[in-house]
Amino acid sequence: MLELDLQIASETSAPDEARFRLWCEMGLRQRSADSELTIRLVDENEGRELNHTWRHKNYATNVLSFPADAPDDMLDIPLLGDLVICVPVVNREAAEQGKSVDAHWAHMVIHGCLHLLGYDHIDDEEAEEMEALERTLLEELGYPDPYAEDESADHPHSDTPSKDHE
């Protein structure tokens, strides 16, 4: 079972909770244990602040992934972590890339969930593995390959900030 906490801190229209639940369950399906996940939908100001705080970049990015660092055995329901999604950025990217808004949202949520499971795209081999899994999961949901038009270019990915700030 997925315990999903959807926090809406954006004035911009976004998908409903049922869509987020579907996309999260798909992205997390390889994890058999119950899990807790928070998704916070933000506008560009908060997205920029968080990206600056955690990654020292002064712009809002599409998705930030914050994996939990508490051991599963310490919690009633294992906390996977948090996704912060900048609604205007995701909507704008969909338009700029000629993708349906729904398909791009599904991609960003699944991409963020995979980061919470430990997937990354720092090097080419990791990126290929992660992208292949994204393609498979999105295809099962009936969405097109998010990288089909972008095979030779660098792919815009969400970012996983380090929690080594303590």
UniProtKB/Swiss-Prot annotation:
Residues reported in the UniProt entry to bind Zn(2+): H111, H115, H121
Annotated GO CC locations: cytoplasm
Keyword Nucleotidyltransferase included in the entry's annotation: no
Main location: cytoplasm
Cellular compartments annotated: Cytoplasm
Gene3D superfamilies, per the entry: Metalloproteases ('zincins'), catalytic domain
EC number(s) on file: 3.1.-.-
Cofactor annotation comment: Binds 1 zinc ion.
Disordered: annotated span: 141-166
Composition skew (Basic and acidic residues), residue ranges: 153-166
GO MF term list: metalloendopeptidase activity; RNA endonuclease activity; zinc ion binding
Domain of life: Bacteria
Signal peptide span: none
Keywords: Cytoplasm, Endonuclease, Hydrolase, Metal-binding, Nuclease, Ribosome biogenesis, rRNA processing, Zinc
Required co-factors: Zn(2+)
An annotated GO BP: rRNA processing
Biological role stated in the UniProt entry: Single strand-specific metallo-endoribonuclease involved in late-stage 70S ribosome quality control and in maturation of the 3' terminus of the 16S rRNA.
Similarity annotation: Belongs to the endoribonuclease YbeY family.
UniProt protein name: Endoribonuclease YbeY
Organism: Pseudomonas savastanoi pv. phaseolicola (strain 1448A / Race 6)
Gene assigned in the entry: ybeY
